[in-house]
């Protein structure tokens, strides 16, 4: 997700013992490059990103986590798994714009 949306910001703090989770929609993706091939290393996130209501949430989109998150083999070889906590901390302009467009035109979720 972060590869295709440059305005998304990752946490990048020192990871703790908490294991990152992925939702049904994001299941099987590499957290860094969105690749579906060769999952290799388990994702660790910082304690702040796994605290309170954020516990067990998807690392990429914030949905309900159903499976463990993994880095792909290529990101592990390039040592991108050592850059810090990979949790996305902001919404990004696409989701923010969608929210305000819905509000502006009065669309409601079913």
Swiss-Prot record:
Single GO biological process annotation from the record: mRNA splicing, via spliceosome
UniProt cross-references to InterPro entries, sorted A to Z = PHF5
The protein's superkingdom reads: Eukaryota
Family, similarity comment: Belongs to the PHF5 family.
Q: Which PANTHER family match?
A: PHD FINGER-LIKE DOMAIN-CONTAINING PROTEIN 5A
Protein's recorded name: PHD finger-like domain-containing protein 5A
Species = Arabidopsis thaliana
The root-end lineage is: Eukaryota, Viridiplantae, Streptophyta, Embryophyta, Tracheophyta
